[in-house]
């Protein structure tokens, strides 16, 4: 029986993780659940899975949760605050940590798990986007196992040789005969929408992804293809890939989740129905396999698999992310922070859909090149970028 800590338990990935655990109750014990401020859902999860600890970032929400759990006669200990969450991520009794807190908020708890040498199921892409080298170095030092949960990175991981899987962050792709890593993306809900209509896109339209069930922020990122841009940055860190070793292709059906091209002409792809429980189950059981609850792919019902080159006029955020990756860690950190501010503003109807890219671009253009040596540097750049983004919003 393995103890699992779920950072971001009330989010989409967290709920999918609990679903996988339901299918494998004899193998996994929920040790701790961590959320933001969703008291009702956290109380329901605690009632069902009975973790030893539960933590909410919001202090008032944590107090309400403690009252509800006491009324339910549950012995789960309720904690709050960043320090407590970091301690849960690094707890000696935890075997596996699902790192699924969205955004920069997940950075420090995930890093705490890395430093503690845990098996980390990495769903928080911002950890590598903002702290790539720091995370890879710390994982190598502590012996932590980094297993990518994002469907694309998980697909690449599965398509690479075993020796590459065992050297996440420093695998020599060329020596292993790998010529290209191919990231696939659906193109989001506006793949065929007229560019003239982009100014009038609403939050409701942007979060209605055609293939995947995701949270609001990541759904908007998928619509702008910033999500694919962040995945591009993350893939470069995870697989030690140069710009020349990366490729992006739009695949509307989301059946092939990504591919690896080899120098002998082979292309190995990982396929499956678009359901996050598949990569979650893979990382939970690695190197073994467990049931995920996902319906098997029915090839008899597949009518077509199509591929399209990305159009940077339609997806300027994707181009921006690729360029930031070439600039370095300061630029990707700034871009990530700007995008969090811009997407939140769009969801709250403060800016138009097209202004997300304008704000992101303004921040990247105005942030000074700064050296990133540690997490303090990252947090400094993150804060600077957020301030520039908020100022830029006043001018849109």
Swiss-Prot record:
Q: Where does NADPH bind?
A: 10-13, 36-38, 124, 126, 215
Top-level enzyme category: oxidoreductase
The organism sits in which domain of life? Answer: Bacteria
**A single Pfam family, by name?**
DXPR_C
Q: Which cofactor does it need?
A: Mg(2+); Mn(2+)
Q: Which reaction does it catalyse?
A: 2-C-methyl-D-erythritol 4-phosphate + NADP(+) = 1-deoxy-D-xylulose 5-phosphate + NADPH + H(+)
Which keywords belong to this entry? Isoprene biosynthesis, Manganese, Metal-binding, NADP, Oxidoreductase
Q: Name one GO molecular function term.
A: NADPH binding
Signal peptide range equals none
- Which residues are 1-deoxy-D-xylulose 5-phosphate-binding? 125, 151-152, 186, 209, 222, 227-228, 231
Q: Please list the residues that bind Mn(2+).
A: 150, 152, 231
Q: Which InterPro entries match?
A: DXP_reductoisomerase, DXP_reductoisomerase_C, DXP_reductoisomerase_N, DXPR_C, DXPR_C_sf, NAD(P)-bd_dom_sf
Q: What is its EC number?
A: 1.1.1.267
- Copy the pathway line from the protein's UniProt record: Isoprenoid biosynthesis; isopentenyl diphosphate biosynthesis via DXP pathway; isopentenyl diphosphate from 1-deoxy-D-xylulose 5-phosphate: step 1/6
Q: Biological process GO terms, please?
A: isopentenyl diphosphate biosynthetic process, methylerythritol 4-phosphate pathway involved in terpenoid biosynthetic process
User: What is the recorded function of this protein according to its Swiss-Prot or TrEMBL entry?
Assistant: Catalyzes the NADPH-dependent rearrangement and reduction of 1-deoxy-D-xylulose-5-phosphate (DXP) to 2-C-methyl-D-erythritol 4-phosphate (MEP).
User: Entry's PANTHER family?
Assistant: 1-DEOXY-D-XYLULOSE 5-PHOSPHATE REDUCTOISOMERASE, 1-DEOXY-D-XYLULOSE 5-PHOSPHATE REDUCTOISOMERASE, CHLOROPLASTIC
Q: Which family does it belong to?
A: Belongs to the DXR family.
Protein name in UniProt: 1-deoxy-D-xylulose 5-phosphate reductoisomerase
Say which species the protein is native to.
Haemophilus ducreyi (strain 35000HP / ATCC 700724)
Upper lineage:
Bacteria, Pseudomonadati, Pseudomonadota, Gammaproteobacteria, Pasteurellales
């Amino acid at each position: 029986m393995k103890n699992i800590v779920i950072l971001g338990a009330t989010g989409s990935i967290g709920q999918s993780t609990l679903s996988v655990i339901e299918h494998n109750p004899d193998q996994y014990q929920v040790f701790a659940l961590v959320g933001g401020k969703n008291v009702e859902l956290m109380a329901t999860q605690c009632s069902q899975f009975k973790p030893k600890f539960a933590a909410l970032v919001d202090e008032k929400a944590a107090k309400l949760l403690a009252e509800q759990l006491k009324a339910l006669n549950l012995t789960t200990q309720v904690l709050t605050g960043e320090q407590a969450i970091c301690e849960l991520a690094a707890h000696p009794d935890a075997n596996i940590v699902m790192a699924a807190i969205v955004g920069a908020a997940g950075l420090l708890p995930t890093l705490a798990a890395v430093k503690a040498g845990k098996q980390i199921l990495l769903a928080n892409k911002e950890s590598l986007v903002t702290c790539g080298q720091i995370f890879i170095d710390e994982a190598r030092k502590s012996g932590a196992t980094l297993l990518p949960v994002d469907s694309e990175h998980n697909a690449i991981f599965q398509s690479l040789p075993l020796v590459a899987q065992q050297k996440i962050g420093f695998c020599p792709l060329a020596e292993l005969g790998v010529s290209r890593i191919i990231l696939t993306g659906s193109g989001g809900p506006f793949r065929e929408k007229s560019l003239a209509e982009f100014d009038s896109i609403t939050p409701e339209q942007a979060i209605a992804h055609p293939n995947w069930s995701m949270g609001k922020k990541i759904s908007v990122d998928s619509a702008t293809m910033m999500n694919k841009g962040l995945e591009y940055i993350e893939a470069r860190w995870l697989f030690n890939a140069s710009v020349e070793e990366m490729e992006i292709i739009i695949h509307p059906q989301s059946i092939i989740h990504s591919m690896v091209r080899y120098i002998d002409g082979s292309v190995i792809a990982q396929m499956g129905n678009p359901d996050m429980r598949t990569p979650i189950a893979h990382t939970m059981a690695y190197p073994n396999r467990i049931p995920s609850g996902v319906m098997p792919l029915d090839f008899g019902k597949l009518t077509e698999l199509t591929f399209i080159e990305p159009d940077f006029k339609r997806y300027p955020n994707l181009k921006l992310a690729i360029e930031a990756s070439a600039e370095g860690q300061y630029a990707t950190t700034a871009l990530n922070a700007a995008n969090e501010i811009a997407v939140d503003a769009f969801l709250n109807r403060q800016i138009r859909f097209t202004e997300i890219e304008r704000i992101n671009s303004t921040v990247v253009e105005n942030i000074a090149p700064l050296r990133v040596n540690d997490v303090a540097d990252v947090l400094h750049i993150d804060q600077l970028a957020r301030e520039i983004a908020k100022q830029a919003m006043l001018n849109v």
